[in-house]
C-alpha cells in the first residue's frame, strides 16, 4: 500500500491538506497533530508520513531520532552477534542506531498490514538509505505483541 503513497515530512500544511490524523490511541494522535512540531524544533526527532495522493489521507506517520547502541548493556548473545560483523580494530563501545519514537497507522487503514510495510521502510538495509547498524522501537505499552523482523521482498 505504501508504494502507492507519497512520502513527506509531517508539517502543519500537510495536516491541513489531509484534514488531520487519527489513530486508536489519543496520546499518539495528539503527538502527530500537535507535539511533533516541538520535537522537530528541539531537534529531538523528525516526523514523516505517507499520504494517499488520490484522497489526501494520511495513511501512517512515524518519528525517528538518532540514537546509539551501548554494546556493554546488551545481553551477551546480542553483543556477540553485533560485534561479529565488525573487525576487532574497528569495534567500539557504542554504535549509531535509529530510534523510532512514535509510530501510528491511521484508523482508516488499520488492519491492512501498513505497520509491517512501514517498519520495512524504516529498517536498516545493507545498501539502503539508513547506514546504522540497528533500529530501536520504543514500545508504547509494556507488552510487545511480537518481535519485528524485516520481511524479504517477494515473500
Please report, for each region that a protein language model flagged, where it lies by residue.
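A short, internal acetyl-CoA/4′-phosphopantetheine-binding micro-motif in the GNAT/acyltransferase core
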Residues: 101-111
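Short hydrophobic/aromatic beta-strand element in the GNAT-like acyltransferase core
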Residues: 45-49, 61, 97, 102, ...
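Short amphipathic alpha-helix that is part of the acyltransferase structural core
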Residues: 1-42, 47
Amino acid at each position: 500500500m505504501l508504494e502507492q503513497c507519497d512520502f513527506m515530512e509531517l508539517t502543519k500544511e500537510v495536516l491541513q491538506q489531509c484534514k488531520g490524523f487519527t489513530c486508536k490511541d489519543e496520546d499518539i494522535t495528539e503527538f502527530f497533530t500537535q507535539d511533533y512540531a516541538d520535537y522537530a524544533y528541539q531537534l529531538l526527532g523528525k516526523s514523516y508520513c505517507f499520504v494517499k495522493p488520490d484522497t489526501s489521507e494520511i495513511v501512517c506517520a512515524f518519528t525517528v531520532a538518532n540514537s546509539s547502541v551501548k554494546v556493554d548493556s546488551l545481553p551477551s548473545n546480542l553483543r556477540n552477534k553485533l560485534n561479529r560483523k565488525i573487525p576487532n580494530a574497528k569495534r567500539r563501545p557504542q554504535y549509531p542506531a535509529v530510534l523510532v519514537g512514535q509510530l501510528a497507522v491511521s484508523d482508516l487503514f488499520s488492519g491492512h498490514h501498513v505497520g509491517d510495510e512501514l517498519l520495512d521502510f524504516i529498517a536498516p538495509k545493507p545498501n539502503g538509505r539508513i547506514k546504522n547498524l540497528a533500529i530501536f522501537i520504543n514500545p508504547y505499552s509494556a507488552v510487545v505483541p511480537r518481535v519485528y523482523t524485516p520481511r524479504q521482498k517477494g515473500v
